Curated annotation (Swiss-Prot):
Subunit structure as annotated in this protein's UniProt entry: Heterodimer of a catalytic subunit (MsrP) and a heme-binding subunit (MsrQ).
Transmembrane intervals: 10-30, 42-62, 75-95, 110-130, 143-163, 169-189
Any one GO CC term of the record: plasma membrane
Cofactor note: Binds 1 FMN per subunit.
Keyword check for Hydrolase: no
Protein name: Protein-methionine-sulfoxide reductase heme-binding subunit MsrQ
Single GO term (MF): electron transfer activity
Biological function: Part of the MsrPQ system that repairs oxidized periplasmic proteins containing methionine sulfoxide residues (Met-O), using respiratory chain electrons. Thus protects these proteins from oxidative-stress damage caused by reactive species of oxygen and chlorine generated by the host defense mechanisms. MsrPQ is essential for the maintenance of envelope integrity under bleach stress, rescuing a wide series of structurally unrelated periplasmic proteins from methionine oxidation.
Coiled-coil zones: none
NCBIfam families: PRK05419.1-2
Family membership: Belongs to the MsrQ family.
One Pfam family hit: Ferric_reduct
Co-factor requirement: FMN; heme b
Amino acid sequence: MRYPWLRLAIFIVGCLFPLWWLYEAAMNLLGPDPGKILMDRLGLGALIFLLITLSMTPLQKLTGWSGWIVVRRQLGLWCFAYIVLHLLCYLFFILGLDWGQFAVELRKRPYIIVGALGFIGLLALAVTSNRYSQRRLGGRWKKLHKLVYVILGLGLLHFLWIVRSDLREWAIYAVIGGFLMVLRVPAVARRVPRIMGRRGRVAS
């Protein structure tokens, strides 16, 4: 296994935050509605993991270090894990497993539909994020995994719909997401290594 310490560090960080939040909830440090706080933090954590995952390819191109790509799948799976926990918090703490209320929520809060679509997309990517699926799908695998940018857009829209009144934090993530999308445009992606190469030659 390549870069085991980096993989271990990501695993520890991925576990640490939910465990710490659970500790805060157990100690009554999350206020009167700890379930909602947990749900919100896990959703935001998933968005952050998604942005970090999408930054791995540009970082590899900029630095030439293969470690970024090696941990990309692991980061993506942590994003999915946080989304699953986010969804479970919603089902248990917000709905109380009342499926009749779920239908009402869908009508009243369309952002839940947007979030559900993002979850379905992430589920498809998580299930196929293995070498077996790569071999079976062939060229279609890359096309499928480009869906991650649609998922990012859905995640940002879901977040925007929830915050509405205070857009400052949302704007930070939206700018980062937009920048990462621009870096994936073929014309831009081709120029980035050249720009870095020119800087390296100037510095030397």
